Amino acid sequence: MNRKKKNKYTALYAFGGVFVLLVAALVFLNGQGEASDLYGGKKVSSLNPATQELLNDPNYQQIILPDQLKSKVDNKENFFVYFFASDCPHCRATTPELMPLADDAGITMHQYNLREYQEGWREYNIEFTPTLVYFENGVEKERMVGGLKPEGSSEGYSIDDFKQFLAKYKGSVTK
């Protein structure tokens, strides 16, 4: 009788363990299927891992989708677009400095993630990231190719270079 009881409890524990594992797996898989509003409802699990890391970063909340960008161009609007790649180290160094500058200037800095929307490389003639582009009447007017100048380097731009670029076109930007 004692052995029967032992087998009964062992089976009960095994069943309980399997049940807990199944519930945990369902919770995990459900979270992976969560849609990202920033990326037009794409499932989080389908995004590049570097993009997933940035989903809650306050410096990467102005994502513009390809159709939205095309619409702005077609409507002949004046606006800035910051082309970046979520896995680009120069972008990761530049974005936290650039976004507050845009906010302080009252400019909406649209961010186009080339890692997620590869067609942007060709459509907007982007060779390197980051690239900041000003569009006037839906046509590219000027661009800055490259990020912040690392200390001790002669390559890249200073904060003042970015401030001047934003100030140059700030008055003509449509929201």
Question: Which functions belong to the PLM regions below?
Answer:
Residues 1-56, 175:
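N-terminal targeting signals for export/organelle localization
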Residues 56, 68-103:
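Local sequence-structure signature of Cys/Sec-based thiol-disulfide redox active-site neighborhoods
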Residues 63, 83, 106-120:
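Thiol-based oxidoreductase modules, predominantly thioredoxin-like and allied folds used
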Residues 80-82, 110-111, 131-134:
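Structural recognition of the beta-strand scaffold that forms the well-ordered cores
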Residues 91-92, 119-122, 143-144:
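Extracytoplasmic/secreted cell-surface and envelope-processing proteins
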Residues 124-136:
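Structural micro-motif
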Residues 133-175:
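Non-catalytic, surface beta->alpha helical segment in thiol-disulfide oxidoreductase systems
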